[in-house]
Amino acid sequence: MSNTTTGRIPLWFVGMVGGLAALGLLAIFFYGSYVGLGSSL
């Protein structure tokens, strides 16, 4: 795997951050719906 990160954000970093953000939003949504606040979303 060549080092092609010349002034750009690496693709794996974007994927990791995007995946963590999506998981975080899903966790918050499911937790809110479990508690009873998710219905307002």
Swiss-Prot record:
<keyword id="KW-0472">Membrane</keyword>
<comment type="subunit">
    <text>PSII is composed of 1 copy each of membrane proteins PsbA, PsbB, PsbC, PsbD, PsbE, PsbF, PsbH, PsbI, PsbJ, PsbK, PsbL, PsbM, PsbT, PsbX, PsbY, PsbZ, Psb30/Ycf12, at least 3 peripheral proteins of the oxygen-evolving complex and a large number of cofactors. It forms dimeric complexes.</text>
</comment>
<comment type="similarity">
    <text>Belongs to the PsbJ family.</text>
</comment>
<keyword id="KW-1133">Transmembrane helix</keyword>
<dbReference type="InterPro" id="IPR002682">
    <property type="entry name" value="PSII_PsbJ"/>
</dbReference>
<dbReference type="GO" id="GO:0015979">
    <property type="term" value="P:photosynthesis"/>
</dbReference>
<dbReference type="Pfam" id="PF01788">
    <property type="entry name" value="PsbJ"/>
</dbReference>
<keyword id="KW-0604">Photosystem II</keyword>
<dbReference type="GO" id="GO:0009539">
    <property type="term" value="C:photosystem II reaction center"/>
</dbReference>
<keyword id="KW-0934">Plastid</keyword>
<dbReference type="InterPro" id="IPR037267">
    <property type="entry name" value="PSII_PsbJ_sf"/>
</dbReference>
<keyword id="KW-0812">Transmembrane</keyword>
<comment type="function">
    <text>One of the components of the core complex of photosystem II (PSII). PSII is a light-driven water:plastoquinone oxidoreductase that uses light energy to abstract electrons from H(2)O, generating O(2) and a proton gradient subsequently used for ATP formation. It consists of a core antenna complex that captures photons, and an electron transfer chain that converts photonic excitation into a charge separation.</text>
</comment>
<dbReference type="GO" id="GO:0009535">
    <property type="term" value="C:chloroplast thylakoid membrane"/>
</dbReference>
<feature type="transmembrane region" description="Helical">
    <location>
        <begin position="9"/>
        <end position="29"/>
    </location>
</feature>
<keyword id="KW-0793">Thylakoid</keyword>
<keyword id="KW-0674">Reaction center</keyword>
<keyword id="KW-0602">Photosynthesis</keyword>
<protein>
    <recommendedName>
        <fullName>Photosystem II reaction center protein J</fullName>
    </recommendedName>
</protein>
<keyword id="KW-0150">Chloroplast</keyword>
